[in-house]
Every structure is written in structure tokens, then in C-alpha cells.
Design a protein with these regions (language model features):
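Intrinsically disordered, low-complexity, basic-enriched segments
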Residues: 1-93
């Protein structure tokens, strides 16, 4: 059983992360951003490869990608303002 949303969120985080060079990005901060996003997105569990492919296609639409990016950017900004790792808080633009 796999939560396809988790895989997609991780991929999108890796794609967006370089756009925010001031963000700490340590394991703790990355985990906090992923958890923030996953708690605001609907999970999509699958048990077959076919289900995974179909769900990836659904989550790959422009509308879903935009929604995911908005949630991830919100998470990046919130975590950057109060990093639990001890890094200096920063405001991301």
C-alpha cells in the first residue's frame, strides 16, 4: 500500500526547494514542510501499480500541481519563520 500523495509532495518539494535559497532545508525543516503539506492535502492510497499510475495522472493535472505548489510554498514560508532546528528565522519572498 502506497500513499501516492506523499511521493508527489516529495518530488514537488525537491523541485521547488532551489527557488528558496534562504530556506534552511535540513532534514528537520524538510520534514516539517512535508508534514505541513500532507496534513492539508487529501491522501491517495493505492495497492497496485495501475492505481499508482492513474493517481499520478490525476495529481499531475495543472490544477492539482498548482494546489500542491501553493501548499508547499505556504509550508516553506511558515517553517522558515520558525525553524525548529535552530536556524535563524527568515522571511521568504
Amino acid at each position: 500500500m502506497t500513499n501516492v500523495t506523499l511521493e508527489v509532495v516529495r518530488r514537488e518539494y525537491d523541485r521547488l526547494r532551489p527557488r528558496f535559497p534562504g530556506f534552511c532545508g535540513c532534514d528537520t525543516c524538510q520534514g516539517d514542510v512535508l508534514v505541513y503539506a500532507l496534513n492539508r492535502l487529501q491522501p491517495h492510497y493505492v495497492s497496485t501499480r495501475q492505481g499508482e499510475v492513474l493517481t499520478e495522472l490525476t495529481l499531475g493535472t495543472d490544477q492539482e500541481k498548482a494546489r500542491l505548489d501553493v501548499v508547499l510554498i505556504e509550508g516553506l514560508r511558515k517553517v522558515a519563520l520558525a525553524p525548529r532546528c535552530g536556524a535563524k528565522p527568515v522571511t521568504l519572498v
